[in-house]
A protein has these predicted regions:
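Glycine- and small/polar-enriched repetitive beta-structure motifs of secreted/surface proteins
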Residues: 1-439
Length: 439
């Protein structure tokens, strides 16, 4: 067969059909390899076979399904009963009934597809209010524009998961990315440009680039990786990773930082950890800090249960709390200290101002400024201490104390050239090592 006009293949009894115009395959019986081009195209073809149909009403109420493809105007116009659909333009899957393997490419794409199955979208309105959705993918323009009712979603560009309703497995990729995902139990992973763009309502977020978790609504188990990372996160189990990391976290929770500006001015704190570059960059307001490298506790505000580990370690912390600082510049000019312990390299370096100090190695209490209950244990120990209630234990012990007060110095060079007196005691090896000047 081929048939060209008016009622075209009017109730033909099969073989290899093609039909071109008016009512095209007008109620063809019994199917086979159909193609039909125009006006009512596959006009209620019965009983189906391998369909294709190109224009006007295209698969116009085809019965009963099979391997459909349809191209323009009303495309899969209310196809019944479905099969392996593809539809390309204008109203694309025009309220297809009932679902199966769908793909639709342009304009209104999955125009209110009914009833779901394996959807893919692609352009302009993409999954335009797919009802009742299924295993969705949607690629461009308005991507998942108000998909209803969700499911295993993926959406790639422009407005990506644009107000997806009602959520589920989400993965979202570009431009306005998570654009206000709605509603719950979404497994979110969201990748670029405006990334988490006010996710609603949260769930298990991981977000990777540009403005990352920008003003996230409402929380979830966040991780966000680059540029503005956890940008104004409100809140939940946060982790950051790079560039501005916690860029003004609001409001706290289980924070971790990691790179460049780490906990950049996080407010209001919680269980912080921050790892590199500027680490706890002027964190506000304190809580259970740990900070590990480069700027470590870079001017942390306001204190709490601090530990800081390397490079500039306790860099001019403000305002104190129960400090420990471990390496290189250790308690570097701590302000305003508290129950200090400092362990290596320059240990107490220029400590300001006091606390329960115990300081263990390298240059130990290196020219303390204003002490407290001081003990300093190894290498240069009290290296040129000025004032305080000393105890010092090993190697150069009281090394050139200035200006001494209570003393006690126990081993190796003990009182090492002590300067200037007070209540000294020195016990071992070099003990009062030709003391200068007594008491």
């Amino acid at each position: 067969n081929t048939g060209i006009g008016y009622s075209a293949l009017l109730a033909n009894t099969a073989a290899n059909n093609t039909a071109v115009g008016s009512n095209a395959l007008a109620a063809n019986t019994t199917g086979t390899r159909n193609v039909a081009f125009g006006y009512a195209a596959l006009d209620a073809n019965t009983t189906a076979s391998y369909n294709s149909a190109f224009g006007t009403f295209s698969l116009s109420d085809n019965t009963t399904g099979a391997n459909n493809t349809a191209l323009g105007y009303y495309a899969l116009a209310v196809n019944t009963t479905a099969s392996d659909n593809t539809a390309v333009g204008y109203q694309a899957l025009g309220a297809n009934t009932s679902g199966t393997r769908n793909t639709a490419t342009g304009r209104s794409a999955l125009t209110t597809a009914t009833t779901g199955d394996d959807n893919t979208g692609l352009g302009y309105y993409a999954l335009v209010s797919a009802t009742t959705a299924s295993d969705n993918t949607a690629v461009g323009s308005s991507a998942m524009e108000n998909a209803t009712t969700g499911y295993a979603n993926t959406a790639v560009g422009k407005d990506a998961a644009k107000q997806l309703t009602t959520s589920y497995g989400n993965t979202v990729m570009g431009f306005q990315a998570g654009q206000a995902i709605t509603t719950g139990n979404g497994g979110n992973v969201i990748i670029g440009w405006q990334a988490g763009q006010r996710i609603t309502t949260g769930e298990t977020n991981i977000v990777i680039g540009k403005k990352a978790l920008e003003e996230n609504l409402t929380g979830g188990n966040n991780v966000a990786v680059g540029y503005n990372a956890l940008g104004d996160v409100t809140s939940s189990a946060n982790t950051g990773v790079g560039h501005e990391v916690m860029a003004v976290t609001s409001t706290g929770e289980a924070n971790t930082g990691m790179g460049f500006r780490a906990l950049k001015a996080n407010t209001t704190a919680s269980y912080n950890t921050a790892v590199g570059h500027s680490a706890l960059t002027t964190n506000t307001t304190g809580a259970q800090n740990t900070a590990i490298g480069q700027g470590a506790m870079n001017d942390n505000t306001t204190g709490s249960y601090n530990v800081a580990v390397g490079v500039s370690a306790f860099t001019t912390n403000t305002t104190g709390s129960e400090n420990t600082a471990v390496g290189f510049e250790a308690l570097k000019a701590a302000t305003t200290a508290d129950n200090n312990v400092a362990i290596g390299r320059l240990a107490g370096v220029g400590l300001t101002t006091g606390g329960g100090n115990t300081i263990l190695g390298a240059a130990a209490l290196q020219t303390m400024t204003t002490g407290s209950s001081i003990v300093a244990i190894g290498l240069s120990t009290l290296a040129s201490a000025t004032g305080g209630s000393h105890t010092a234990v090993g190697y150069q012990a009281g090394l050139d104390i200035t200006t001494a007060v209570q003393g006690t110095y126990l081993g190796y060079q003990a009182g090492a050239n002590l300067t200037t007196g007070n209540n000294n005691v020195a016990v071992g090896y070099g003990s009062l090592s030709t003391c200068t000047t007594g008491s």
